[in-house]
């Protein structure tokens, strides 16, 4: 389902842009940046 797809995407982001980049993207995606 969507959850497993999201987890796979998160792992891909972590590998490709690094932890900080992935967190920033997730923050923007959630529109919840401090």
From Swiss-Prot:
Parts forming coiled coils: none
Expression (tissue specificity): Expressed by the skin glands.
Any one cellular-component term (Gene Ontology): extracellular region
Record has DNA repair as a keyword: no
Domain of life from the UniProt record: Eukaryota
Disulfide bonds: 27-33
GO BP term (any one): defense response to bacterium
Annotated localization: Secreted
Transmembrane segments: none
Protein keywords: Amphibian defense peptide, Antibiotic, Antimicrobial, Disulfide bond, Secreted
Function: Antimicrobial peptide. Active against the Gram-positive bacteria S.aureus FDA209P (MIC=14.9 ug/ml) and B.subtilis ATCC 6633 (MIC>64 ug/ml), but not active against the Gram-negative bacterium E.coli or the fungus C.albicans.
Similarity comment: family membership: Belongs to the frog skin active peptide (FSAP) family. Brevinin subfamily.
Name of protein: Brevinin-2GHa
